[in-house]
């Protein structure tokens, strides 16, 4: 299977058949999109995270052009994870819309999604994953969890974000979810998996902030 970036694969698995984030957890799912973009930058050593502050340390590579707007935002100055999530989730919505469009257009260019009109008045562009793309990607992730050996940083980031935003349960059985939970616990105890363990902690920090923001918006 031709793999894509973490944020592209997260989008494919998170949106529903109409090209929208699930209505019951739209805020968490959209915030997960931002977290996935940060993970792509982190995995490519474009940013570093220290004391929950994200700092750009080098130029973005061409293959991550679909998160150029996120990179430009972070390059302005170091941002805390809290500030990042608030700016993307609870300001005008312009940043999130721009990021979503970038992802959708990048997937459209490789025929991974189709572009259609959506919204109440049909004036919104939505990007719908091609049939079978979800299933193929889920099989890859399921195999990564169940087989022996280390899970790649890419797959670990994707799995963690899907899990923390409650978008994994629809694809994994209860026993498979338990297997992933066990793998995560083992990883955190393994001194040879320090980088992966740190990445899992970053995702957990981000999703904890996501939930706080969501609860604040509800109240």
Question: Model regions: which residues?
Answer:
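Short, amphipathic alpha-helical interface elements at domain boundaries
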Residues: 1-94, 201-219
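An acidic intrinsically disordered interaction segment
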Residues: 1-6, 120-132
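Short, well-structured alpha-helical interface segments that form or flank functional binding sites
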Residues: 32-36, 98, 102, 156
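Short, structured motif recognition centered on aromatic/hydrophobic residues
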Residues: 38-41, 107, 158-163
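Short, Lys/Arg-rich nucleic-acid/phosphate-binding segment
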Residues: 52-54, 117-121
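Short, amphipathic alpha-helical interaction segments positioned at domain boundaries
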Residues: 61-88, 99, 125-160, 165-168
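Ordered, amphipathic secondary-structure segments that act as subunit-interaction surfaces
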Residues: 79-116
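Short hydrophobic helical membrane-anchoring segments positioned at the boundary
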Residues: 143-219
């Amino acid at each position: 299977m031709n793999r894509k970036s973490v944020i592209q694969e997260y989008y494919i698995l998170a949106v529903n058949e109409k090209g929208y984030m699930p209505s019951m957890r739209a805020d968490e799912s959209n915030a997960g999109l931002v977290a996935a973009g940060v993970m792509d930058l982190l995995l490519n050593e474009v940013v570093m995270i220290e004391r929950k502050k994200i700092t750009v340390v080098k130029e973005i590579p061409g293959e991550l052009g679909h998160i150029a707007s996120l990179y430009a935002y972070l390059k302005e100055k170091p941002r805390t994870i809290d500030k990042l999530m608030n700016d993307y989730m609870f300001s005008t919505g312009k940043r999130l819309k721009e990021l979503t469009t970038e992802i959708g257009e990048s997937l459209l260019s490789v025929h991974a999604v189709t572009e259609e009109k959506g919204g109440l008045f049909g004036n919104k562009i939505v990007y719908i994953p091609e049939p079978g793309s979800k299933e193929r990607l889920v099989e890859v992730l399921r195999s990564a969890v169940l087989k022996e050996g280390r899970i790649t940083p890419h797959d670990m980031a994707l799995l963690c974000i899907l899990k923390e935003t409650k978008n994994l349960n629809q694809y994994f059985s209860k026993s498979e979810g338990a297997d992933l939970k066990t793998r995560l616990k083992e990883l955190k105890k393994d001194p040879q998996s320090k980088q992966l363990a740190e990445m899992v902690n970053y995702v957990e920090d981000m999703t904890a902030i996501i939930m706080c923001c969501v609860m604040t918006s509800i109240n």
